[in-house]
Amino acid sequence: GAIRGRQLGAKDLLTPTSFHRENMHMEESKMQTKETFMAHPEITDQEVKNALNHAIEQVERQVPEFYDEFPAAASKDNFYPKIENVDWTNGFWTGEIWLAYEETKDEKLKEAALHQVSNFKNRIEKKIAVEHHDMGFLYSLSCVAAYKLTGSEEAKEAALLAADNLMSRFQEKGQFFQAWGKLGALDNYRLIIDCLMNMPLLFWASEVTGDEKYKEKALAHIRTCMKVVVREDGSTFHTYFFDPETGAPVRGVTAQGNRNGSIWARGQSWGVYGCAMAYKYCKDPVYVDYFREVADVFMKHLPSDLVPYWDFDFEEGSDEPRDASSAAIVACGMLEMAKYLDKEEAAYYTSCARRLLKALTDHCLYKDEKESNGILLHCTYARSTPTNTCNNNGVDECCTWGDYFYMEALVRLCAEWETYW
């Protein structure tokens, strides 16, 4: 099982806790309490149906446009430009098509998604832009989904090749999947919290092949990740470095958050959904504890309209941009975890998810095709600050994962849904 303690390397001058608390400035008075959060309205069943239909209409409208090509990771002025199948985000669009197909049973959607599966097979066979850890984001929502829904052998083969590709990034020293860059390089010897959502691809690979090696490495990575990225107060680091010589944990830093000690909203949301997925596959109760902690921190830091700022350094009244996508991810994680909890706690997290989805639907859902060719507005891909390492990209725009997770959460509320993850 996972170990709850934090094992810190000799190079840690500050523990994650002290680093975080010295820097934390959000006033308690501005935080959501359980009472203030639960005072918000839930999305009704009819509103769920209406919002999902509205989202599906947008997918149907965009399929001819994004058939051979894909929407970019983020929109520009709320309209996605076209890109080839070369980014870590391409799978989200194909996932949206599969969700729309499941709801409508429209053969045109199935055909379009399978057409893209062939594109994904070509990508992994030719090793086009796959030297990173995001094989799950790319292949769970495109090819595993296709295999589960249609039995496509081509999809199964592509997804297994992607799983093998991900396995090549496992670092024995440290027991984690290296996210980016040249394997073993000192400046890239780290994991990132997002990778929790790449692990389901490996659990699936073990299920369909009978080979436990995929599952074993996934479990090792999850154990390592949760030990180092979750701080004592339930907030999270975006990325964590290890010593390539010894494998010892070294330090938590941000790439896309405001600064190393802040709480990047989407990182926190990957933690929420990642814990739910970890529990789904390993049933270790420690992941329920982690889930409660990270979900609680996420909800506490929401402003009064429940649409999260891109980083939780920012609070009510700030003019910093929001990241609606992180709330959609959290809603999915809550609805997944609710399957495994007792009745009372399951009802609580389902109710929390409904409140988040009500806020997203009221404030962030596109109005019509003149406004956007995406679905969920007010997302932020990357916001550059003097204390992080990213460039501005998709600030207050649509992001493909925001569209996808918003749809997934609505689908989860409409019916029993077998996940693609």
Language-model features, listed with the residues they occupy:
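Glycan-recognition and catalytic cores of secretory/periplasmic carbohydrate-active enzymes
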Residues: M26-W421
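Ala/Thr-enriched low-complexity intrinsically disordered regions
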Residues: A2, A10, T15-T17
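Intrinsic-disorder-associated, low-complexity terminal segments enriched in Asp/Asn/His/Tyr and depleted
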Residues: D12, H20-H25
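Basic polycationic patches enriched in arginine
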Residues: R4-R6, R21
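A generic alpha-helix propensity feature with a strong bias for hydrophobic helices
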Residues: P16-F19, A74
